[in-house]
């Protein structure tokens, strides 16, 4: 078995090293990740300049002067000697739940695998800090091992959030849907040394829909959250109303 491992926190991130170590007994693991922290990079590709790939002498990890999506894209289309059986991303320093998934470089790295027909799993530690990173890596390895032994049909994309708790305090796995957040906090306006205004993006909004069955609810109650995602963003329930709206303008059949 072959696993391609990436992340969005960068190739020096503790979460990447811990997950790499945890996956080594399961498969042949190739690690390629961004050179710098790319949190919030989403599915961005670098098209305005060439990319370079270097290899860290101490870990053997490859790193790219680009985004998480760049990293997986380069690996799958320009470097891989053989097609991986699974793309894995993480472990992210912080949760990726609800609308986070649209911004997340961690989820994006996994999504790029799906774009090329490779099943993928993204892992995030639900609270920032590495207090229980070893426990999270153990959980991630268990999920990957179960997937490799019992693959899901098709080309699944799983978004996994793990509570930042000791292993024995975890209550198990729950398959969830995405919850929903309140809008993000306003930007933080400051002034630079030259007197010019600068802006920091504000914090993510608090949970709006954290009802039973959501990723937010699972994490709050000590469960590992596993959410199946898809690439198709079509709002199928809106198709009839949108067709009627277009026909009313006399511009649609």
Curated annotation (Swiss-Prot):
Does Nucleotide-binding count among this protein's keywords? yes
- Which cellular component appears as one GO term in the record? cytoplasm
Catalytic reaction list? a ribonucleoside 5'-phosphate + H2O = a ribonucleoside + phosphate
GO-annotated molecular function? 3'-nucleotidase activity; 5'-nucleotidase activity; exopolyphosphatase activity; metal ion binding; nucleotide binding
Q: Name one Pfam family in it.
A: SurE
The EC number on file is 3.1.3.5
Q: Which UniProt key words apply to this protein? A: Cytoplasm, Hydrolase, Metal-binding, Nucleotide-binding
Could you tell me where this protein is found in the cell? Cytoplasm
Q: Which residues form the signal peptide?
A: none
Q: Which InterPro entries match?
A: SurE (IPR030048), SurE-like_Pase/nucleotidase (IPR002828), SurE-like_sf (IPR036523)
The reply to whether Magnesium figures as a keyword in the UniProt entry is no
| Bilayer-spanning residue ranges | none
What binding details are noted for the cofactor? Binds 1 divalent metal cation per subunit.
Q: Where does a divalent metal cation bind?
A: 8-9, 39, 92
Requisite cofactors: a divalent metal cation
Read off the HAMAP family from this record: SurE (MF_00060)
- What task does this protein carry out? Nucleotidase that shows phosphatase activity on nucleoside 5'-monophosphates.
The entry assigns this protein to a family as follows:
Belongs to the SurE nucleotidase family.
Its name, as the record gives it, is 5'-nucleotidase SurE
In the UniProt record, the gene name given for this protein reads surE
């Amino acid at each position: 078995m072959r696993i391609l491992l990436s992340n969005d926190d960068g190739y020096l991130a503790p979460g990447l090293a811990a997950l790499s170590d945890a996956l080594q007994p399961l498969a042949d693991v190739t690690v390629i990740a961004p050179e710098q922290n790319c949190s919030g990079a989403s599915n961005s590709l670098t098209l305005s300049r060439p990319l370079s790939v270097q290899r860290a002498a101490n870990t053997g990890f490859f790193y790219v002067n680009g985004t998480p999506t760049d990293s997986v894209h380069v690996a799958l289309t320009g470097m891989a000697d053989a097609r991986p059986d699974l793309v894995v991303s993480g472990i992210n320093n912080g949760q990726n739940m609800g609308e986070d998934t649209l911004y997340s470089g961690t989820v994006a790295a996994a999504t790029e695998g799906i774009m090329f027909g490779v099943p993928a799993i993204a892992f995030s530690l639900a609270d920032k800090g590495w207090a229980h990173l070893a426990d999270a890596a153990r959980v991630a390895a268990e999920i990957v091992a179960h997937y490799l032994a019992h693959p899901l049909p098709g080309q699944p994309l799983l978004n996994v959030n793990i509570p930042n708790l000791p292993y024995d305090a975890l209550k198990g796995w729950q398959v969830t849907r995405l919850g929903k957040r309140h809008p993000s906090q306003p930007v933080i306006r400051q002034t630079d040394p030259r007197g010019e205004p600068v802006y920091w993006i504000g914090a993510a909004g608090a949970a709006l829909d954290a009802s039973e069955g959501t990723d937010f609810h699972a994490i709050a109650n000590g469960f590992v959250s596993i959410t199946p995602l898809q690439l198709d963003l079509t709002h199928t329930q809106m198709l009839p109303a949108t067709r009627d709206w277009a026909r009313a303008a006399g511009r649609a059949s």
